[in-house]
């Protein structure tokens, strides 16, 4: 992450500068566009492998639209509308490269292509799923609609769902990096929220001995669509997630209280984490 900063659009806090990251899912172009997808497995992980592929694409005037690259594999969408080559021809030329092990491809349908070459979606060693913000917003609104916007049942349900998710996430991190590295890697664990599209979460304070922490969340996905529309803090799922995650970090049950929220007009959501009171859910 660079040290470059910018003023956040919804507040005076200076936060690290982030660039949007597109999910490698689909591409849409004008009707009649010749879209295609390639998924190439390299025989090793050597410098220059991708350059050899892009040389072929450049020679045939193939426009790369988007892609996803990981060790020894590169998947990408292309626009062949101005190209002199067919998908099949490109596959043959790519297969002829010395470091290419396999090449998969598919053609789009009248200017639209959706990734049909990869499953499941993975986050590290764990399977992941994607939801659009409007979709998950509708899902999280439903318990409030059923049990009443201000009633406790919907809030408790969302909070407990979040708590379970946070505990599960931290356990997965522990299995990946080792339990003894969790405290050291807490800044990176906070960065996972941004990487997953949840928002920009900043760890402002932490005291491992007392089991307390303060987190600021910019663009909190649970609240951002209700910005400035409500009088009290709105986040239930995210505060539950933080409570579950930090309960695992501190190895004791803690609660997360949202002390300010963007739905109230604040520039960010602020959560205070502290040991749970006896008898709390």
Please identify what each model-predicted range represents.
Residues 234-251:
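Active-site helix/loop of acyl-thioester processing domains in fatty-acid/polyketide metabolism
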Residues 65-66, 258-260:
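Beta-strand-rich interaction surfaces with strong enrichment in secreted/lumenal proteins
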Residues 66-73:
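RNA-recognition motif
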Residues 43-65, 91-94:
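Short amphipathic alpha-helix segments
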């Amino acid at each position: 992450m660079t040290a470059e900063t910018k003023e956040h659009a919804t507040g005076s806090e200076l936060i690290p500068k982030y660039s949007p990251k597109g999910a490698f899912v689909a591409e849409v172009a004008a009707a009649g566009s010749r879209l295609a997808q390639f998924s190439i497995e390299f025989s090793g992980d050597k410098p220059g492998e991708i350059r050899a592929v892009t040389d072929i694409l450049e020679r045939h005037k193939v426009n790369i639209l988007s892609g996803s690259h990981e060790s020894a594999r590169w998947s990408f969408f292309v626009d062949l509308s101005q190209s002199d080559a067919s998908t099949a021809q490109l596959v043959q030329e790519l297969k002829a490269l010395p470091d290419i092990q396999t090449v998969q491809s598919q053609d789009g349908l009248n200017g639209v292509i959706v990734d049909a070459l990869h499953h499941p979606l993975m986050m590290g060693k764990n399977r992941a799923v994607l939801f659009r913000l409007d979709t998950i917003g509708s899902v999280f609104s439903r318990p409030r609609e059923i049990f009443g916007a201000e009633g406790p049942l919907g809030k408790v349900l969302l909070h407990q769902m979040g708590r379970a998710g946070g505990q599960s996430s931290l356990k997965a991190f522990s299995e990946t990096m080792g339990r003894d590295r969790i405290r050291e890697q807490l800044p990176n664990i906070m960065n996972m929220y941004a990487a997953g599209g949840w928002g920009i979460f900043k760890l402002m304070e932490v005291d491992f001995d007392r089991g307390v922490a303060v987190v600021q969340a910019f663009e909190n996905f649970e609240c951002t669509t209700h910005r400035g529309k409500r009088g009290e803090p709105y986040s239930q799922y995210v505060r539950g997630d933080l409570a579950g995650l930090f309960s695992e970090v501190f190895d004791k049950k803690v609660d997360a209280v949202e002390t300010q929220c963007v739905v109230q007009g604040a520039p960010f959501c602020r959560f205070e984490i502290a040991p749970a009171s006896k008898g709390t859910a």
